[in-house]
Amino acid sequence: MKKIRKGDSVVLLTGRDKGKQGTVTAVLENKLVIEGVNIYKKSVKPNPAAGVTGGMIDKTMPVHISNVAVVDGNGKPSRVGIKLVDGKKQRFLKTTGATLSA
């Protein structure tokens, strides 16, 4: 069971965007794509056949999963634990003990 999932609210712990909060939009193997965080400018070549105009675009790049933490109800970073409830695994926040949605 993955500890961080799509839709979780997270905060960056390191890097140039340290302290910024966002929502996970995609989970890759060991990386997360977070909305509005780690945005880089990429150059795109024009492709008239596909209807793409060239130029600079803003692209959200992935962040390693070790550099983020889930945000608890108080807005503070928290680690995520897994416990068994009625024979099923349930994610919970270690700071408050609150359970996270499935």
From Swiss-Prot:
GO terms for molecular function: rRNA binding; structural constituent of ribosome. GO terms for biological process: translation. InterPro entries: KOW, Rib_uL2_dom2, Ribosomal_uL24, Ribosomal_uL24_KOW, Translation_prot_SH3-like_sf. It comes from the Bacteria. GO terms for cellular component: ribonucleoprotein complex; ribosome. Keywords: Ribonucleoprotein, Ribosomal protein, RNA-binding, rRNA-binding. Pfam families: KOW, ribosomal_L24. SMART domains: KOW (SM00739). One of two assembly initiator proteins, it binds directly to the 5'-end of the 23S rRNA, where it nucleates assembly of the 50S subunit. One of the proteins that surrounds the polypeptide exit tunnel on the outside of the subunit. Part of the 50S ribosomal subunit. PANTHER family: MITOCHONDRIAL RIBOSOMAL PROTEIN L24. Belongs to the universal ribosomal protein uL24 family. This is Large ribosomal subunit protein uL24.
